C-alpha cells in the first residue's frame, strides 16, 4: 500500500502519516524532511530537479506513507500512490494546532529534521512563510483544491479518504491496516 496524506499546514498530516505507517508497518516519508535542507534552504526553490529526484526515489518503494502538499513534485509520488488521505480539519482547529506546535517547538529548541539544524524561532513568527501565517493564508485555497481533487471519494480511480477529526482518523487507520493484511 502506498498512501499520500495531504491537508493544510496544521491539519494533522504528519501525525496521521506516522500513525498510518506504523499501523501498516511501512516507511513514513515526510516531504518537508526532504525539502528543508540545513539553514532552512528550500530545496524545491533552489534545486527543483533534485527535490523531484529525491521524492521520486522515495516513491520507488513497494509500500510507504508520504505526507506533504508540494505540487511541484506531485507527479513523482501521486502517480505511484494506491490511496489518498485528505486531512480536512476546520480552520480554527488548524490554527490552534499550528500555534501550539510552533510554540512548543520554539520553547524546546529541538531540531525539526535530523541533520538540518533547523529549529523553530520566535522571531520568525512574523514572516509571511511562517507556518502560522501560512496556515491562515492558505487554508481556504487548499480546502477548495482538495475538495475538487478528492470530493467524490476517488482520485483517478483510486480511493481518497476525507478525515475531519481524530475519531475518523483512528477508524481509517484501522480500516487500512485491515485491508493491508488481506492483500
Where are these regions (language model features)?
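Hydrophobic anchor at the beta1->P-loop junction of P-loop NTPases
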Residues: 5
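The conserved Walker
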Residues: 9
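Conserved lysine of the Walker
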Residues: 13
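Hydrophobic positions on the alpha1 helix immediately C-terminal to the Walker A/P-loop
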Residues: 16
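Active-site signature of alpha/beta-hydrolase-fold catalytic machinery across serine-
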Residues: 19
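NTP-dependent small-molecule kinase module
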Residues: 23, 133-183
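Conserved nucleotide-sensing/catalytic segment adjacent to the nucleotide-binding pocket
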Residues: 27-84, 89
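A glycine- and Lys/Arg-enriched "phosphate-lid" helix/loop adjacent to the NTP-binding pocket
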Residues: 89-142
